[in-house]
A protein has these predicted regions:
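Acidic, Ser/Thr/Pro-rich intrinsically disordered cytosolic tails and loops
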Residues: 1-206
Length: 206
């Protein structure tokens, strides 16, 4: 068994090693979005798009088995946090783990990332820092950045989709909380808080 450092990893595999199954599923969702195969539905949910034959033929390569499993699940709108619990997606993640374990990147029996895998992910983060702009990046580069930098990359690279689809938390000014604190005599500085619902803009276009 090798230490896995010579294995060429796809973005969803990097995400699995770095942050676990939910991060891998997030990368798969963004992959499908960049291909035009899914879209945000009701606030905080995602659904598969109806793709015509011309769009289907135009795909350069098929999505990964994990992304294909996610796409199949999204025939019905779903929240991102629910996807990782879907039996088909859990099976796809389990199958994903097999070659990674064989390469020495996951340890038996619990299949947590090995020291070599964690070191490799850290090295990739240093080699691929977040850019100042999302422009000029290939889709593969975008996916790798999402795998390595998580929510910060989502807010930079696919801000509108990430916000509407519930992939990132919604930041908003809590006016009611400020008033409540004011009545208590507190002297808070910011008053901003994180919430999964409510208003807030999504940044620039994608």
């Amino acid at each position: 068994m090798s230490d896995g450092t010579a294995v060429r990893l796809e973005p969803h595999e990097v995400a699995l090693l770095g942050e676990g199954p939910r991060a891998a599923v997030t990368v798969a969702v963004v992959d499908l979005h960049l291909r035009g195969l899914v879209e945000a539905d009701l606030p905080g949910t995602i659904r598969a798009r109806v793709v015509d034959a011309v769009e289907a033929v135009g795909a350069v390569q098929p999505p990964s088995p994990l992304a294909a499993a996610v796409h199949g699940c999204l025939r019905v709108p779903a929240a991102p946090k629910a996807l990782v619990k879907d039996p088909g997606i859990r099976l796809a993640v389990a199958v994903m783990r097999i070659p990674l374990a064989e390469a020495g990147l996951l340890r038996y029996p619990l299949l947590g990332a090995t020291r070599a895998a964690r070191r490799h992910v850290r090295d990739l983060r240093h080699e691929h820092p977040l850019p100042a702009s999302r422009h000029g990046l290939t889709d593969h580069e975008r996916l790798l950045l999402v795998a390595l930098h998580g929510e910060a990359a989502l807010r930079l690279l696919v801000p509108r989709f990430a916000l509407r689809a519930g992939l990132v938390r919604r930041a908003e000014v809590g006016r009611a909380a400020l008033l409540k604190d004011s009545r208590r005599g507190t002297n808070g500085g910011g008053g901003a808080f994180l919430s999964c619902g409510g208003g807030g803009g999504g940044g620039g276009g994608e």
